[in-house]
Design a protein with these regions (language model features):
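Structured, active/binding-site neighborhoods that engage oxygen-rich ligands
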Residues: 1-361
Length: 361
């Protein structure tokens, strides 16, 4: 069985590892762009076609995007562990408890009304306790001590990237319906963000990952989730508009530096970051009939994503998630992986998700 462009279809385990590691790589590269020389890196070259870990000095550190993505994995793993043992569990409650443990790792305290979660394997890693410029709304939403729901979300006006940046793992769970993937993701987004565009962006991003993991071609999956975004009850118009713009812009392959920002936004809001990442992976994809190595597509897409500006770490992370889910871990450039901070932690969480979903490992 082959994937698009003649690339052999990856296994589910490879897609899970590829998605999580790809997101961490994009996050690390994007964070280096945001921080620049103050982070002890030179940052990507501004020359066209250049940009990657080859341009960095020292270890490439990922940010809060990857931290929260891994805690999303942990919450899902706990819920699936309960389910596999024959005990039903509230998935969103498991995710809330996981996020509360992340909150504590950042030196923040939840009010006494919030539960005190029991520690798990993920909590023993120093790299996940480092404070890496966490998104404000994630902190305030969790520190409220309230478990937000889709009917009563916390931070009702929050529409930043903190939802979409952590939502790839929902799309990695196999054998569940698309509407269930969307609900899991958007419900979890309600734990920290209340604005419809932030919650719907998270759900649509998870659906995109789900379709890719299920074997859909990249362009087909992108078109499908764009249509899904417009068909949602009480659909946020800005999400559909940004995604449609990303498809149009990628199709025209207009690579001028100003136009993507004008059309897609700066990338600081959830729907903008998703649209920019989608544009980056589509506009760098091989043309029909063209042979292209997956690792080159990954390099080109992530480099373009992080050059956009705005929340570069998030945009790079989303692009890395998408291509890792599409191609599996074979698309990840070996030199980039060698430079990545704590890949064993990312792999460890990927292994746990593989085990509870497939029984492997």
């Amino acid at each position: 069985m082959s994937n698009e462009h003649g690339v052999p279809a990856p296994t589910l385990a490879s897609r899970i590892h590829g998605c999580l590691l790809g997101g961490a790589l994009g996050d690390a590269l994007g964070d280096s762009v945001e921080a620049g020389p103050t982070a002890g890196t030179r940052g990507p070259s501004s020359q066209a076609g250049v940009g990657g870990f080859d341009d960095l000095s020292g270890v490439a550190r990922f940010g809060d995007d990857t931290q929260l993505t891994l805690y999303t994995v942990d919450g899902l793993v706990e819920a699936l562990e309960w389910a596999n043992s024959g005990v039903g569990a509230d998935v969103n409650a498991c995710l809330w408890l996981a996020y509360l443990r992340w909150l504590a790792s950042q030196g923040e305290e939840a009010p006494p009304s919030a539960p005190v979660p029991q520690p798990r394997w993920i909590d023993g890693h120093e790299v996940l306790r480092q404070r890496r410029h966490p998104e404000k709304d994630c902190i305030t939403g969790l520190a409220s001590g309230e478990m937000g729901t889709s009917f009563r979300p916390v931070n009702p006006e929050a529409k930043g990237v903190g939802t979409v940046m952590r939502s790839a793992p929902f799309g990695l769970v196999p054998h569940i319906a698309s509407d269930a993937v969307y609900k899991l993701s958007s419900d979890a987004a309600s734990l920290t963000h209340g604005h419809p565009s932030a919650r719907q962006s998270a759900g649509i991003f998870s659906l995109l990952i789900h379709r890719l993991v299920s074997g859909a071609a990249l362009a087909d999956a992108a078109a499908e989730v764009t249509a899904d975004a417009g068909a949602l009850p009480d659909a946020a118009p800005e999400l559909r508009e940004r995604l449609e713009a990303a498809l149009r812009l990628a199709d025209k392959r207009e690579a001028g530096p100003e136009r993507p920002v004008q059309v897609l936004g700066e990338g600081r809001l959830a729907e903008e970051a998703l649209a920019v990442a989608l544009y980056a992976v589509l506009s760098t994809a091989p043309a029909e009939g063209e042979e292209k190595q997956p690792d080159r597509h990954f390099r080109d897409a992530v480099a373009l994503a992080v050059k956009h500006g705005g929340a570069s770490g998030t945009i790079g992370s989303l692009a890395g998630n998408i291509l890792g889910a599409l191609y599996g871990e074979d698309c990840l450039p070996a030199p980039w992986l060698a430079a990545l901070e704590a890949p064993e932690v990312v792999r460890g969480m990927a292994d746990q998700l593989v085990k509870v979903t497939t029984g492997e490992g």
